[in-house]
Curated annotation (Swiss-Prot):
Source species: Salmonella enteritidis PT4 (strain P125109)
Superkingdom of the organism of origin: Bacteria
Broad EC category: translocase
Gene Ontology CC terms, in alphabetical order: plasma membrane
InterPro entries: NqrB/RnfD, RnfD_bac
Residue ranges of the TM segments: 20-40, 42-62, 69-91, 123-143, 215-235, 242-262, 267-287, 301-321, 322-342
Localisation: Cell inner membrane
Pfam families per the UniProt record, alphabetical: NQR2_RnfD_RnfE (PF03116)
Classification of source organism: Bacteria, Pseudomonadati, Pseudomonadota, Gammaproteobacteria, Enterobacterales
Name listed for the protein in its UniProt record: Ion-translocating oxidoreductase complex subunit D
E.C. numbers: 7.-.-.-
Topology term for the membrane: Multi-pass membrane protein
Transport as UniProt keyword: yes
PTM annotation (FMN phosphoryl threonine): residues: 187
Required cofactor names: FMN
């Protein structure tokens, strides 16, 4: 059995590639705005840091490879990689982490394989996973949404936190993570998993401030809905196809519904899975990467469904609260196999 991987991305010229990448950046604006609203200025600062790092790293590698720097940077792929990594990490993560993660994504996960169209794994998720495994504490230190935060840093304090780790008054991440109830806060998925391990019931957990009056966690449901709006825009513009996001979301919802039906005391509800963490970001902006996803319609359905199952398994039984990045990379591994068995039959061709 021989695997044949067609050259990608599956667009015919640089102008078309640039247009699609730019549309994805535009579609990300609602999600970026929502994250900035609920979690502060850090999201924007991380995007700027990641974008600069991505462009500089790409330019350096292209120069070393004696390729045209200007023409390659104009496809916006490096910019998009930096953006996706930046919105995936905590807004007050140290500056060197986003630089390290973005540099690794561009230099190792993308350019080392030959550049755009040759990388088998999503570069942004490679960078994210490297950071998560190397610095788990910093990568899970999300601020509580402003609605339930005891202290919210302003623009200058946000910059100080990113570059020095302290606010002007000497506050640190431990202080800023405290909610209005006086308890250090985490993301809804992280809170759910940690509290279950501590012996709390689902009924008790859902009374925590992070879930107060919300379907899937204060702030997080609106962030996910904002990414959903961007995803619908991409579908409307035909920048992505529906197969991957629909199969991913339906499979995740089905797994979550079945799990919740049979074990409501230990497993999260479908709405928590769908509207928390990086669900919508992953469905429309990460899994749909034309370079690392399946290239056939049937293959896209299988690819999305596989990622949905993996996200549910990792969230429900794994060691990490959110499993989107790991699910994406594991699904990327299967793409050659999926494409091999879902490639349309060529009429008139017979195996000799």
């Amino acid at each position: 059995m021989v695997f044949r991987i067609a050259s990608s991305p599956y667009t015919h010229n640089q102008r078309q590639t640039s247009r699609i990448m730019l549309l994805v950046v535009i579609a990300a604006l609602p999600g970026i705005a929502a994250q900035t609203w609920f979690f502060g200025w850090g999201t924007l600062f991380q995007i700027v840091l990641a974008a600069i790092t991505a462009l500089v790293a790409e330019a350096i590698v292209l120069r070393l490879r004696k390729q045209s720097v200007a023409s390659h940077l104009q496809d916006y792929s490096a910019l998009l990689t930096g953006l996706l990594l930046a919105v995936s990490i905590p807004p007050l993560a140290p500056w060197w982490m986003v630089v390290l993660g973005t540099g690794f994504a561009i230099i190792i996960a993308k350019q080392l394989y030959g550049g755009l169209g040759q990388n088998p794994f999503n570069p942004a998720m490679i960078g994210y996973v490297v950071l998560l495994i190397s610095f788990p504490v910093q990568m899970t230190s999300w601020l509580p949404p402003y609605e339930i935060a005891a202290t919210t840093p302003d623009m200058l304090d946000t910059l100080r936190m990113i570059f020095s780790g302290h606010t002007a008054s000497g506050g640190d991440m431990t202080l800023l993570r405290i909610g209005i109830d006086g308890i250090s806060q985490a993301t809804p998925l992280d809170t759910f998993k940690t509290s279950l391990r501590a012996g709390h019931s689902v009924e008790q957990i859902m009374q925590y401030p992070i879930y107060s009056g919300a379907l899937a966690g204060v702030g997080w449901q609106w962030v996910n809905l904002a990414w959903l709006v961007g995803g619908v825009f991409l579908l409307w513009q035909k920048a992505i196809r529906w197969h991957i996001p629909v199969s991913f979301l339906l499979t995740l919802a089905l797994c979550a519904a079945l799990g919740w039906l049979f074990s409501p005391a230990t497993l999260a509800s479908p709405q928590l899975h769908l509207l928390s963490g990086a669900t919508m970001l992953g469905a429309f902006f990460i899994l749909t990467d034309p370079v690392t996803a399946s290239t056939t319609n049937h293959g896209r359905l299988i690819f999305g469904a596989l990622a949905g199952v993996l996200v549910w398994l990792i969230r429900s039984f794994g060691g990490y609260p959110d499993g989107v990045a790991f699910a994406v990379l594991l699904a990327n591994i299967t793409v050659p196999l999926i494409d091999y068995y879902t490639r349309p039959r060529v009429y008139g061709h017979r195996k000799g």
